[in-house]
Curated annotation (Swiss-Prot):
SUPFAM superfamilies named in the record: Globin-like (SSF46458)
Name listed for the protein in its UniProt record: Extracellular globin-3
Entries under Pfam families matching the protein: Globin (PF00042)
Keywords from the named record: Disulfide bond, Heme, Iron, Metal-binding, Oxygen transport, Secreted, Signal, Transport
Cysteines paired by S-S bonds: 24-156
GO function term, MF aspect, one: heme binding
Organism this protein belongs to: Lumbricus terrestris
Keyword Ligase part of the UniProt annotation: no
Signal sequence range: 1-17
Keyword check for Secreted: yes
């Protein structure tokens, strides 16, 4: 019993000592990477990513209407069109990159820092948009993953989305 308590305390200390505001453990990122990989095994994975990305972004725009203005240059009015489809794929590819780098923290930090800078220079992008995007993912992923592990995904996605939105003021 004491041994289990010490292990739990040790894990808590590691999580609290981490420089990030999350604790995506090695086991968490292994679970997330495995489950994420299941989604993209199909030979038509780019089409699936585009469709999934469009669903996420149109849901985001529906839930936070001011997001529509941010996506005007990628033609959100024509969500099935090539410009918006390409943007949806870029976003899913960015998320794919981050998930695949979970086991390489220095590379992950560099990639997320780059994405943070890209969003920092876009006027109107807010931390709340990333929070809502995470919520949408958290409700959508269980619908497509049989063994969805909510705690692992929450731990890892929070770190990813927090880092990307870290340079935003609002």
């Amino acid at each position: 019993m004491l041994r289990q308590l010490l292990v739990l305390v040790g894990l808590a200390v590691v999580c609290l000592a981490d420089e990030h505001e999350h604790c995506c453990s090695e086991e968490d990122h292994r679970i997330v990477q495995k489950q994420w990989d299941i989604l993209w095994r199909d030979t038509e994975s780019s089409k699936i990513k585009i469709g999934f990305g469009r669903l996420l972004l149109t849901k985001l725009a529906k839930d936070i209407p001011d997001v529509n203005d941010l996506f005007k240059r990628v033609d959100i009015e024509h969500a099935e069109g090539p410009k918006f489809s390409a943007h949806a794929l870029r976003i899913l590819n960015g998320l794919d990159l981050a998930i695949n780098l979970l086991d390489d923290p220095p590379a992950l930090d560099a990639a997320l820092d780059h994405l943070a800078h890209q969003h920092e220079v876009r006027e109107g992008v807010q931390k709340a948009h990333f929070k809502k995007f995470g919520e949408i993912l958290a409700t959508g992923l269980p619908q497509v993953l049989d063994d969805y592990d909510a705690l692992a995904w929450k731990s890892c996605l929070k770190g990813i989305l927090t880092k990307i939105s870290s340079r935003l003021n609002a």
